[in-house]
C-alpha cells in the first residue's frame, strides 16, 4: 500500500530480525528506485543489521531505550551509523527514557533521547536536533 501511494513504511520488527531483513532485501531488489523507503521503528537489533538497513536507504528509529543502562547494542548502533540516517522517536506511551523510565512516555521526553545520542557521538545536542529534524522532513517528505 505504501508503495502505491508513495509513502514511506514504518517497520516495527520484534523478534523477527531475519524475516524482516529478508523481506526488505527482496523489496529493495524489486524497487531500487524508491528513495527513503521508510524507518525501522524502535530499533533493537545489532549495529551490523542497522548498517544493512541504512545501505538499503532506511532510517533507524531511536527512542527511549537508548537511555537504558542495558542498551549496549543500541548504543553501539548509534555510535556506528550515520547521524543522517537516525530518527528520534518517543514510542509513546511506552519505553519512557531515563530518568522517567516506567512512566507514561510522551513527546516531552524526546530531549533525553537527543541528549543521549549527542553524548554517545560526542557532539552537541543541538547538532542532533538539527540533523534529526532534517532527516524527519526528508523521510516523511515534508517541506
Question: Regions from the language model: what does each represent?
Answer:
Residues 7, 14, 85, 101-104, ...:
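Basic side chains
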Residues 29-34, 102, 122, 126-127:
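Short, glycine- and charge-enriched coil/turn segments that flank and shape catalytic ligand pockets
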Residues 67, 103-110:
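Short amphipathic alpha-helix initiation/capping segments at coil-to-helix junctions
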Residues 1, 108-143:
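Mid-to-C-terminal alpha-helical segments outside catalytic/metal-binding sites
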Residues 23, 97-98, 139:
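Residues that scaffold the ATP/ADP-binding catalytic core of kinase and kinase-like folds
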Residues 1-87:
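Catalytic pocket-lining loop regions of alpha/beta-barrel enzymes
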Residues 84-106:
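Short acidic/histidine-rich active-site segments
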Residues 60, 94, 138:
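Active-site micro-motifs of SAM-dependent methyltransferase domains
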Amino acid at each position: 500500500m505504501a508503495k502505491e501511494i508513495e509513502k514511506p513504511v514504518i517497520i516495527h520488527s520484534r523478534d523477527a530480525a531475519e524475516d524482516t531483513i529478508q523481506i526488505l532485501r527482496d523489496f529493495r531488489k524489486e524497487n531500487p528506485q524508491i528513495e527513503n523507503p521508510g524507518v525501522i521503528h524502535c530499533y533493537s537489533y545489532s549495529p551490523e543489521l542497522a548498517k544493512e538497513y541504512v545501505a538499503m536507504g532506511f532510517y533507524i528509529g531511536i527512542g527511549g531505550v537508548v537511555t537504558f543502562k542495558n542498551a549496549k547494542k543500541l548504543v553501539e548502533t548509534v555510535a556506528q551509523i550515520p547521524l543522517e540516517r537516525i530518527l528520534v522517536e518517543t514510542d509513546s506511551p511506552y519505553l519512557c527514557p531515563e530518568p522517567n523510565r516506567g512512566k507514561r512516555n510522551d513527546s516531552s521526553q524526546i530531549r533525553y533521547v537527543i541528549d543521549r545520542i549527542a553524548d554517545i557521538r560526542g557532539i552537541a545536542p543541538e547538532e542532533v536536533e538539527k540533523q534529526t529534524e532534517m532527516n524527519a522532513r526528508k523521510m516523511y517528505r515534508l517541506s
